[in-house]
C-alpha cells in the first residue's frame, strides 16, 4: 500500500457552509488558486445544484484550475449529478462526489426509507455518475454511527458500482480515535473488493478529535483525508488541513506518510482564507495562530536563543513565516533584551543594559508586551520622556449624515502643551476622526490593521480598538479604550502618533550617535 496521503480540501464547500455571508465568485477563485499553489490533490469547490451562484463558481474554478483535481458535491439524485457534471465539464480533470446517509437515525428519520432502498439509491447514483467520469467518489454520510454490517455492505456495493474513492465521514464528530480506527480496520478486513478503491475520511470537530481521528484512520489504511484550511466548517468545523500536513511532515519518522503539500504556502493561504471568510484565527491555533511560534517565558526564550529546537518541533520558515517571535514581557530576561538590541544593530557600548532592563520591567508591568520601538525609546530617551505623551486628545465631536455617509469630526488635541483644534470630513465617523487627528498632529501614517473588541462585561464594558500602522517603514501598535467606538478609535490613533513621535526622537539620537562615532574615528 502506498504511503502517499491524498489531501482533499473542502474549504470552498463544507468550509463555506459555516460563513455568515457567502463568498463571491471572485473570492472563491482567489482561494482556489491559493489552494492550487498549496498543492492540494483535490479541491471540492461547491454544490452546483444548490444555487445558480454555486454553479457559476464551480464552473469558473473548474475552467481555471489546472494542477489540482476539481470536485463538486451531489446528492444521490440524477438532477444533482447532472448539475455537477455540467459545471465541471470545462475542467481538465474532475471528480463527482455523491453521497447518501447510511446511519440508522438518518435512514429512518431523515430519508424515511429502508436501508435496502438507500443501498439501491447509492448504487444507482454511482453508476449514473460514471457516465460522466471514471473518477467518482461516494460518501456514506454519518458513517461513524452506521451499524458496521450495513457500512460494509454499502462500501462493497459502491465499489462494485464503480466508485474509485469511498469516503467514511464522522459527520457529527462523534467517534474517538480508537473507535474510528477500528471502523476503518474492519472495512479492510471484511470488504472483499476494498483494494479497488481509495478509502477516504472526513472528520468533524464536535469533540475536538477530527485531526486525531484522521491520523488514526490513515494508520489503519485510509489514504485520503478531507479537510479545510483553518479547520472551518459546519458547527465546530472540520479537520484542519494545516495540522494534518504538518503532523505528517513533522512526524514522518514515526508515521511514515507523505503528502504533496507545499508547506511554505500554509501561512499565506491560511491568512487569505481568514480574511476573505471574515473568520479570525484564534491566537493559540496550532500551526497558524499568532502565538504558534511565539515564546514569552524567560526560560523558553533563553533556550530558543541557545538552540531553536529546544522549544520548536518545526520552524516558522517551514510554513512560510520569517522567524519566531520572542515576545518581550515582564517574564523576559536580560539575555532577550540584549538579543533584541543586537538584532536592531546596537552594541553593548551604545546603552546601559542594567538600566535599560530595569526600565523595561517597569514598562512591561504597566503595558504587557513591549515592542522594539519601546525598547529604543527607553534606551535613548530620558525615562520620563519615553513615557510622556506629546499628543493628548482633549475633545472629539463627530457629526454624521446618514443619507450621504459623510461624517465631520472636530478634535481638540494638546500638542506639546499647546491646544490645537482641527476639523475634517471622512467616509464615516472613524475616518473623519482619523483625518482630523492627522491634521492636528501633522503626521501621516498608513493603517494596515484595525480590530474592534471589548474589555469588561455589561455596563462596565469598554470598546477596545487595536490598530497597527506603518510609519517610516516600521509597524507601530496602538490601543484605545472608551465607551464609544469612535472615541476608542481616535485614542488608538493618538497612541500611535505618540509612538511615532518617540521614534523620531530615537532616530535623531541615533543620527547624532553615528556622527559622534565618525568624528571620534577621524
From Swiss-Prot:
Checking Pfam families in the record gives: HCS_D2, HMGL-like, LeuA_dimer
Its top-level enzyme class, in one word, is transferase
Can you cite a GO biological process for this protein? L-leucine biosynthetic process
Every Pyruvate carboxyltransferase domain range: 5-267
Q: Does the keyword NADP apply?
A: no
Protein biosynthesis among the record's keywords?
A: no
Q: Which UniProt keywords apply?
A: Amino-acid biosynthesis, Branched-chain amino acid biosynthesis, Cytoplasm, Leucine biosynthesis, Manganese, Metal-binding, Transferase
Query: What cofactor is needed?
Result: Mn(2+)
Write out the residues that bind Mn(2+): 14, 202, 204, 238
Q: Can you tell me which family this protein belongs to? A: Belongs to the alpha-IPM synthase/homocitrate synthase family. LeuA type 1 subfamily.
Subunit arrangement? Homodimer.
Functional description taken from the UniProt entry: Catalyzes the condensation of the acetyl group of acetyl-CoA with 3-methyl-2-oxobutanoate (2-ketoisovalerate) to form 3-carboxy-3-hydroxy-4-methylpentanoate (2-isopropylmalate).
Return the protein name: 2-isopropylmalate synthase
Organism, as annotated: Shewanella oneidensis (strain ATCC 700550 / JCM 31522 / CIP 106686 / LMG 19005 / NCIMB 14063 / MR-1)
Amino acid at each position: 500500500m502506498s504511503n502517499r496521503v491524498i489531501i482533499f480540501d473542502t474549504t470552498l464547500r463544507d468550509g463555506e457552509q459555516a460563513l455568515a455571508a457567502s463568498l463571491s465568485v471572485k473570492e472563491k477563485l482567489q482561494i482556489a488558486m491559493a489552494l492550487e499553489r498549496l498543492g492540494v490533490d483535490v479541491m471540492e469547490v461547491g454544490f452546483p445544484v444548490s444555487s445558480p451562484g454555486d454553479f457559476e463558481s464551480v464552473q469558473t474554478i473548474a475552467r481555471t484550475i489546472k494542477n489540482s483535481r476539481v470536485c463538486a458535491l451531489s446528492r444521490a439524485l440524477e438532477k444533482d449529478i447532472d448539475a455537477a457534471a455540467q459545471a465541471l465539464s470545462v475542467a481538465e480533470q474532475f471528480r463527482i462526489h455523491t453521497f447518501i446517509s447510511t446511519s440508522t437515525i438518518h435512514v429512518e428519520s431523515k430519508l424515511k426509507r429502508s436501508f435496502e432502498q438507500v443501498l439501491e439509491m447509492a448504487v444507482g447514483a454511482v453508476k449514473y455518475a460514471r457516465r460522466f467520469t471514471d473518477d467518482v467518489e461516494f460518501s456514506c454520510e454519518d458513517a461513524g454511527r452506521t451499524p458496521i454490517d450495513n457500512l460494509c455492505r454499502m462500501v462493497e456495493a459502491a465499489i462494485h458500482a464503480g466508485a474509485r474513492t469511498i469516503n467514511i465521514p464522522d459527520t457529527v464528530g462523534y467517534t474517538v480515535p480508537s473507535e474510528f480506527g477500528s471502523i476503518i480496520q474492519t472495512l479492510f478486513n471484511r470488504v472483499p473488493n476494498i483494494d479497488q478503491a481509495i478509502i477516504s475520511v472526513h472528520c468533524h470537530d464536535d469533540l475536538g478529535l477530527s485531526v486525531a481521528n484522521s491520523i488514526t484512520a490513515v494508520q489503519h489504511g485510509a489514504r485520503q483525508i478531507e479537510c479545510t484550511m483553518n479547520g472551518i466548517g459546519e458547527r465546530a468545523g472540520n479537520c484542519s488541513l494545516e495540522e494534518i500536513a504538518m503532523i505528517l511532515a513533522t512526524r514522518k519518522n514515526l508515521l511514515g506518510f507523505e503528502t504533496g503539500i507545499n508547506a511554505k504556502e500554509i501561512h499565506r493561504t491560511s491568512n487569505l482564507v481568514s480574511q476573505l471568510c471574515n473568520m479570525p484565527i484564534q491566537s493559540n491555533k496550532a500551526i497558524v495562530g499568532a502565538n504558534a511560534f511565539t515564546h514569552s517565558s524567560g526560560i523558553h526564550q533563553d533556550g530558543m536563543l541557545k538552540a531553536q529546537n529546544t522549544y520548536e518541533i518545526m520552524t516558522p520558515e517551514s510554513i512560510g513565516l520569517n522567524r519566531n517571535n520572542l515576545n518581550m514581557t515582564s517574564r523576559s530576561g536580560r539575555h532577550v533584551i540584549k538579543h533584541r538590541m543586537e538584532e536592531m544593530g546596537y552594541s553593548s557600548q551604545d546603552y546601559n543594559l542594567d538600566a535599560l532592563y530595569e526600565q523595561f520591567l517597569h514598562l512591561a508591568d504597566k503595558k504587557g508586551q513591549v515592542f522594539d520601538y519601546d525598547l529604543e525609546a527607553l534606551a535613548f530617551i530620558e525615562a520620563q520622556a519615553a513615557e510622556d505623551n506629546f499628543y493628548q486628545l482633549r475633545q472629539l465631536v463627530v457629526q454624521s449624515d446618514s443619507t450621504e455617509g459623510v461624517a465631520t469630526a472636530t478634535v481638540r488635541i494638546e500638542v506639546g502643551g499647546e491646544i490645537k483644534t482641527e476639523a475634517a470630513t471622512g467616509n464615516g465617523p472613524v475616518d473623519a476622526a482619523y483625518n482630523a487627528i492627522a491634521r492636528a498632529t501633522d503626521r501621516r501614517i498608513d493603517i494596515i490593521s484595525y480590530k474592534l473588541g471589548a474589555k469588561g462585561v455589561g455596563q462596565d464594558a469598554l470598546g477596545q480598538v487595536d490598530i497597527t500602522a506603518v510609519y517610516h517603514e516600521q509597524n507601530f501598535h496602538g490601543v484605545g479604550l472608551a465607551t464609544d467606538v469612535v472615541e476608542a478609535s481616535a485614542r488608538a490613533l493618538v497612541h500611535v502618533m505618540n509612538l511615532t513621535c518617540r521614534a523620531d526622537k530615537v532616530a535623531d539620537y541615533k543620527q547624532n550617535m553615528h556622527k559622534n562615532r565618525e568624528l571620534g574615528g577621524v
